[in-house]
């Protein structure tokens, strides 16, 4: 059940060890922690968290982001939910979808996908319903471009699921009434600790909505499944085989629809793909490092998120352990990348980050520093500049702009 709760005040922040950040977060705040809403300059931004006793989170948080000056209001708890580690918005309606990354939803060995309605004025979320993800540990969710289906990837279960969306935003079950809405991956790869079996780590619809692309870390494949959002079905189609032990994790299409990128968790690389939209096929054409040359001790390092700048000129990826954002310039004709460097996030464990729709700002989630770091993006070079305004959020692991 969802409900609004008091904002992150000094007493709760003291439990997180974040009181020193409160002053920079509460800029022009209103009751409930939201900035005055100017539709031309501010928008809602949601934060998914890992939940538990402090300093962990309690669910999904919401704030307002001002794209004019790059300020973020004090976050408010928008909905209580267990481990809402990834979020996705409906493309046209006020609905948000979240995974509950657990292995015991409704007394079964699966996680769940949750549908929530958005109050446009406050950002508060009301739960509509939830459905089984069909596997344990769902860690990624997306919505097809038509807004007719939700897609989720199960890390523990090593599978992918498609759930139809009702007109009121609620989710239809996949497994009971529509077995064609579920795919179980199979196989393993060379890393015995992390690749003993399939581990779906992301799922993204193609720009035309005909395919769903799944990075499976456990089998070193980027799988392209045929998608029929109207029927709520997915089916195996093609697959790109990655370097053994690379561990593809997250994926992003370029705005030109001809190129795409994966970030590979285990070997700290980014791979560039040519994408044949008609055939639904990916071809790897370039792979390069996410960290600067000369770093020999990479113990404890792994990558996490990848995103393409709205202009298509730059690509960014996050490094955990190194705790930085890798920056790349894009060659327009080929989609290939040139490494620009890695900017420290001034926090720990950037599991996720997001670029605001204006393309002027990047927000990085420090999972283990319990805060969000704000960066200005140089529109000519793509380089990041830290604004000096970290904002406290408990155990943030996903950032989504509305």
Map each language-model feature to its residues.
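C-terminal segment of N-terminal export signals and the immediately downstream linker at the start
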Residues: 7, 28-46
């Amino acid at each position: 059940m969802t409900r609004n709760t008091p904002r992150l005040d000094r007493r709760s922040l003291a439990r997180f060890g974040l009181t020193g950040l409160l002053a920079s977060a509460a800029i022009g705040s209103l009751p409930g922690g939201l900035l005055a809403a100017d539709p031309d300059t501010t928008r809602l931004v949601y934060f998914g968290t890992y939940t538990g006793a402090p300093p962990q989170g309690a669910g999904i948080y919401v704030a307002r982001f001002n794209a004019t000056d790059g300020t973020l209001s004090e976050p408010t708890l928008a909905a209580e939910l267990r481990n809402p580690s990834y979020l996705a918005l409906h493309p046209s309606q006020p609905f948000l979808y979240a995974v509950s990354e657990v292995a015991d939803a409704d007394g079964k060995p699966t996680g769940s996908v949750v549908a929530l309605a958005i109050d446009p004025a406050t950002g508060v979320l009301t739960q509509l319903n939830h459905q089984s993800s069909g596997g344990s540990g769902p860690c990624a969710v997306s919505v097809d471009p038509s807004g007719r289906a939700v897609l989720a990837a199960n890390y523990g279960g090593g599978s992918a699921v498609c759930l139809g969306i009702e007109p009121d935003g609620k989710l239809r079950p996949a497994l009971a009434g529509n077995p064609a809405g579920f795919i179980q991956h199979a196989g393993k790869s060379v890393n015995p600790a992390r690749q003993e079996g399939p581990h779906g780590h992301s799922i993204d619809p193609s720009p035309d909505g005909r395919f769903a692309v799944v990075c499976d870390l456990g089998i070193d494949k980027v799988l392209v499944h045929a998608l029929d959002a109207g029927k709520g079905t997915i089916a195996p189609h093609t697959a790109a085989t990655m370097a053994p032990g690379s561990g593809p994790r997250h994926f992003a299409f370029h705005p030109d629809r001809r190129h795409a990128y994966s970030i590979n968790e285990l070997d700290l690389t980014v791979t560039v793909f040519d994408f044949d939209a008609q055939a639904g096929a990916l071809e790897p054409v370039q792979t390069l490092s996410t960290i600067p040359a000369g770093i020999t001790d990479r113990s404890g390092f792994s990558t996490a998120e990848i995103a393409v700048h709205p202009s298509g000129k730059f690509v960014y990826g996050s490094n955990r352990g190194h705790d930085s954002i890798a920056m790349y310039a894009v060659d327009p004709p080929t989609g290939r990348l040139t490494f620009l460097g890695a900017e420290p996030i001034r926090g720990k464990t950037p599991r996720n980050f997001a670029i605001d729709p204006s393309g002027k700002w990047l927000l990085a989630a420090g999972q283990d520093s319990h805060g969000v770091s704000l960066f200005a993006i140089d529109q000519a070079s793509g380089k990041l500049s830290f604004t000096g305004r970290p904002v406290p959020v408990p155990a943030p692991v996903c950032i989504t702009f509305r």
